[in-house]
Design a protein with these regions (language model features):
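Short, hydrophobic/amphipathic alpha-helical patches that form generic packing surfaces
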Residues: 1-2, 117, 153
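Intrinsically disordered, low-complexity segments enriched in polar/charged residues with Gly/Pro
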Residues: 6-7, 43-46, 161-162
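Hydrophobic, proline/glycine-rich low-complexity stretches
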Residues: 1-32, 133-140
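Catalytic-pocket segment enriched in acidic/His residues
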Residues: 132-203
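HotDog/MaoC-like acyl-thioester-processing domains
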Residues: 16-107, 174-177, 182-204
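Histidine-centered active-site/metal-ligand motif
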Residues: 15-17, 126, 147
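Catalytic strand-loop segment that frames the active site of acyl-thioester-processing enzymes
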Residues: 73-145, 160
Length: 204
């Protein structure tokens, strides 16, 4: 995507799902997939006003090839008046009930910016307040969002490891992070992580 579109490759992208599983030993005779010249397979379709993207790659990790599949979406037309927008981890006004044993994490907008810079994710929804709302997410004009792999990394860091060697991350919503104003005390979003399931809930 970056090679084809440059900076615009990141505009408005929303991470929907990530699946990771071992496919074969790196020393085996089988060649890694997917069968693309650069080792990356990208599928794109247009549906109901959205561009849907699936990217698959295999990477070597500690003697195994791991197949990693990312599913992303980008709005291509304005939403209908009756359309249901992408949600957040906690709907506005909802009670913040968490299972017992949850681990709490304070996420600031500077954390989101640091993640975006370290990971090379130049998506403006992480960096510029208001851009997430323009991309179709249900957030305020003074907020940036954390979603996708940042939330997945927080979950994986705290959840109990799976014996199946498979990781499936489903990103059902974003965490709305208030942008701190210059000279004001730093604001944050409060996240609760279930250490058993890895589910993340956002407090208000």
């Amino acid at each position: 995507l970056w090679d084809c579109r440059g900076e615009t490759a990141w505009e408005g992208l929303v991470h929907r799902r990530c699946r990771m599983s071992p496919s074969s030993p790196t020393g085996g005779a089988a060649a890694p997939g997917p069968a693309a010249a650069d080792g990356i397979s990208i599928r794109q379709v247009e549906r109901a006003g959205w561009e849907l993207i699936q990217a698959t790659v295999e990477v070597p990790v500690e003697g195994w090839y791991w197949r990693v599949t990312h599913e992303l979406a980008r709005r291509t037309s304005p939403p209908r008046p009756d359309a249901v927008e992408n949600g957040t981890l906690t709907a506005p006004g909802a009670r913040f009930d968490t299972p017992s044993g949850c681990v709490f994490y304070r996420l600031t907008d500077s954390d989101v910016v640091s993640w975006a810079q370290a990971s090379g994710d130049r998506n403006p929804i992480h960096l510029l307040p208001g851009r997430a709302a323009e991309a179709g997410l249900s957030v305020g004009s003074g907020e940036v969002v954390a979603h996708g792999l940042l939330l997945g990394a927080i979950s994986l860091a705290l959840v109990q490891p799976s014996p199946s060697w498979q990781v499936g991350l489903v990103f059902i919503g974003s965490a709305d992070v208030p942008a701190s104003e210059c000279g004001a005390e730093e604001s944050w979003a409060m996240l609760a992580v279930d250490p058993v399931s890895g589910d993340i809930t956002q407090g208000r």
